[in-house]
Amino acid sequence: MLRSRRLALLCLATPLWLAACASVTPTRGFDASETAASQLYTGRFSANYVRYGRNEGVQGSFRWQEQGRNVRLDLVSPLGQTLAIVTATPSGATLDLPNEAPRNAPEVDSLMEQALGFSLPVSGMRDWLHGRAAPGTPSNVTRDANGRPDTLRQSGWTVRYLAWQDTPENATPTTTLPRRIDMARDGNESPLSVRLVIDPENKE
């Protein structure tokens, strides 16, 4: 119980989370060349990781908006304060934090790791949120009795699909969307586990 309370209040225990009461405005927009339909996912997240040899944890809600290969990810504390806004496009990534100058990098994963101490695998999540492996990268997928992904291993991550959204009877494995996803980074050097619980009303 004590550990759970510490994790729930972690967002108030470090300078980053204390600064979250300030408003955060994303500085990078989506690439204008993208014409694909926009998709929106919202839900809750939790992450457990090791930083400076100590076990850490954070949780809150997220808002994931994608258009083609463009992604904007908002992380919000349990108190409703913006923790970070991540914008990733084919041309680069930007991380906006409260009361700090925007940080830019060619890709988003290492940018989050350096600034936050943990990194959601945004590059892979573009496809994993749809219940599929990312194209162009080796993967290993096991499926359940309904043909839906059960475990997906790709890019140094193990992704487990633990629950699926309620769907019409005529839904197929390619149209069903995940409800709960557990992700763990492979290896022991920098342990990181992430849980996503996706709201059922998400839609394209």
From Swiss-Prot:
A lipid is attached at C21 (N-palmitoyl cysteine). It is a lipid-anchor. Its main location: membrane. GO terms for biological process: lipoprotein localization to outer membrane; protein transport. One of its GO terms (cellular component) is cell outer membrane. Residues 131-150 are annotated as: Disordered. Belongs to the LolB family. This is Outer-membrane lipoprotein LolB. It comes from Cupriavidus metallidurans (strain ATCC 43123 / DSM 2839 / NBRC 102507 / CH34) (Ralstonia metallidurans).
